[in-house]
Structures are given as C-alpha cells and as structure tokens.
C-alpha cells in the first residue's frame, strides 16, 4: 500500500492491528495472507534457520548466513510489516544476511503502541542499526514508500554518529525530501480503501473483508498520519551512495521527483526505472534483489 500524504480522519486508533500483508488470528501468532504467497495463509516463520543476535523486536531476521559478506535491512511501506520482504530475502545469493524492520503495532508487536512520526521511528531504530553499521561489512538500508523516508532519516542519524563508512541507501517508490506536493486527503475509510485498491500491492481478499480491514486500518491510519506530519530538511544529505528505484507508472512519484534524490547524497547516485505502478517491486523481485546486491558489492562511494 502507499503512504499517502494525508491520513483518513478517524477516532483514536486501537493498539491491536494487523498489516495489510498479514492478519491476526486469535492470538499473538499471525498468518501471512500476502499477495506474494498467492493468498495462501501460513505461519510467519520466515526467520527459521537464521542466526539471531539477541532478541531485537525492531529487526526481524529473514535470512541468515555463517559467513556474512553483506547485510540488507528492508523498511516496510505504510501499514506494512516485515513479512512482506520474506520472498525477497530468499532470492539473495549466499553470504547475505537479510532482515526487515518490524514497526510496533502489527504482527508479533501488535500489543505495542504505534510510533506516530517518521522521525520517531528512525530515533527508536537507531540503537539496533548502530550494531550492524559498526561492523566492517556492507550494510544496505532499503526502504519502500514510507519506508524510504524512515531509511533516509536512519541513514542521517548513522551519519551523525560517523557510522556510514560501509552503508548504502536504496529508496523506492518515494519522492525526494526536497519535493513539495499537495497533501492527499481521505474523508472516509472507504476513500482510503479505494485509494489502496487503485495502487495495488494489497491482496483484494483483504480489502474486501471487513474483519481483516478492521485489523489493518489502525496501522494504515497511523502510518499515513506519520507521513503527513513528516517534515524533512529539504537540503539534508547523506554521505552514502543512493540507489533510487521507481515504477514508470507510479501515480505517487514522477520521474523528476525520483531523480531529485540525487541532490540528497554527497556520494554516488543511480536511478533505475522499472515497469509498473507504486508496487512495481513485487513484480520484479529478482531484479530488485540483483540491484540491491550490486549496490552492496560496489566498491566506489
């Protein structure tokens, strides 16, 4: 789902929520009813076989390796969860340690209160990311839509700590921080659901189920409001290479808005345009993984 510039007006949201790429069933366990699994429900056990370093609620391991040559951390879109990136993790070559951020208020963190700002998410994530950024292996932060903003803010914070020597940033489906756009407004939940349906990326079975949407909408509303409140510094720059991925039919990002990311790095910049709309990456998983891996292994900064 997209992160719209304006959240739907709604009363105070409940803490219990499930992402649009997964549903809560009875207990704290969840099952994935994701587009990438063909709509089949299964337990969210994507981290099996992964060598975990402690129990960090912010980072869900998706693929581990004994001999790490690079690490990748995915940052989900608004309303999304770590499980969305499990199919991507399986496509990386040997030697890649792959994980995804798990925002509070969804899946195994459903009892935790939401974080209501993009900046707050980056602040809370920083201790977890510091550990990996301090190690002498490439670390690629990959964010899609709202996740691109969280990844960018996280990279800025790592830079303040002088921990970006081995970092790379991949932003996807998101206009550059220097771009100003008119806020999108949704007067009702139905308007928001219609918007999500147009963008794709959400299983139609979930969108058409009132019960599932009751679980998913609190996270969606929270994240959309976070994006609406986000006020990036227009001239902020990171000292890491930036790869920008965009869909050639993405209604949320124009080619010029994607290319504007070039002004937000003092290192290398590359723009890759792929066929598709806002969720183009779901249809090009192998290509996205190849581009991210190439970014990790590039020697130049």
Task: Give residue ranges: language-model regions.
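Compositionally biased, low-complexity flexible segments
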Residues: 1-48
């Amino acid at each position: 789902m997209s992160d719209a510039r304006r959240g739907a007006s709604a009363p105070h949201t409940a803490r219990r929520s499930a992402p649009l790429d997964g549903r809560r069933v009875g207990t704290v366990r969840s099952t994935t009813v994701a587009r990438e699994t063909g709509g089949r429900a299964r337990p969210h056990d994507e981290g099996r076989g992964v060598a975990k370093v402690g129990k960090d609620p912010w980072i869900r391991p998706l693929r581990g390796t004994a001999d790490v040559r690079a690490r990748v951390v995915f940052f989900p879109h608004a309303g999304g969860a770590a499980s969305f990136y499990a199919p991507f993790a399986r496509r990386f070559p040997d030697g890649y340690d792959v994980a995804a951020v798990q925002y509070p208020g969804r899946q195994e963190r459903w009892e935790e209160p939401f974080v209501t700002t993009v900046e707050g998410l980056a602040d809370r994530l920083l201790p977890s990311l510091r550990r990996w950024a301090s190690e002498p292996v490439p670390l690629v932060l990959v964010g899609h839509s709202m996740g691109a903003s969280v990844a960018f803010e996280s990279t800025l914070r790592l830079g303040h700590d002088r921990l970006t020597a081995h970092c790379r940033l991949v932003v996807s489906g998101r206009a550059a921080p220097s771009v100003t756009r008119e806020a999108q407004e949704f007067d009702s939940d139905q308007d928001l659901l219609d918007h999500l349906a147009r963008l794709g990326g959400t299983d139609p079975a979930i969108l058409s189920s009132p019960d599932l949407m009751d679980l998913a909408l609190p996270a969606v509303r929270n994240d959309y409001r976070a994006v609406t409140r986000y006020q990036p510094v227009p001239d902020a720059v990171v000292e890491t290479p930036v790869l920008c991925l965009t869909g050639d039919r993405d209604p949320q990002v124009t080619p010029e808005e994607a290319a504007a990311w070039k002004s937000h790095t003092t290192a290398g910049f590359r723009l890759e345009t792929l066929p598709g709309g806002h969720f183009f990456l779901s249809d090009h998983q192998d290509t996205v993984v190849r581009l991210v891996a190439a970014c990790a292994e590039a020697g130049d900064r």
